[in-house]
Amino acid sequence: MYRKTVEELQKDQREKLVIDIRSEQDYIKETYPGAKHIFWEEFMEHIGEIPKELPVYLFCYTGQRSDEIAEDLSEQGYEIYSIEGGYRS
């Protein structure tokens, strides 16, 4: 698991998956362009929807929950990044 800034995410020109793990209300209100929504409490129920062949960027409010989930996914062989500081950074 690696931490990346929003700027590093924006510079990554590869095909990638960006996942917003905040509440649905916050996702609807505002999110990163093209981000998929999976609420953090339900994340592991949707693990089969996440392709291992793409880099995955996760973000939450502060970076704490995305760090925790990213660590789990890293152990399962995903190329996973947690956005440092969360959505507002």
Report the location of each language-model feature:
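Short active-site oxyanion
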Residues: 14-17, 33-34, 54-56
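Short, structured coil segments at secondary-structure junctions
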Residues: 31-33, 76
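Structural signal for short hydrophobic segments within the conserved structured cores
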Residues: 17, 36-38, 81
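Flexible, polar/low-complexity N-terminal or interdomain linker segments that lie immediately upstream
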Residues: 1-30, 40
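Catalytic cysteine-centered active loop of the rhodanese-like fold, especially the PTP/DSP P-loop
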Residues: 44, 49-89
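Short, composition-biased local secondary-structure segments
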Residues: 36-46
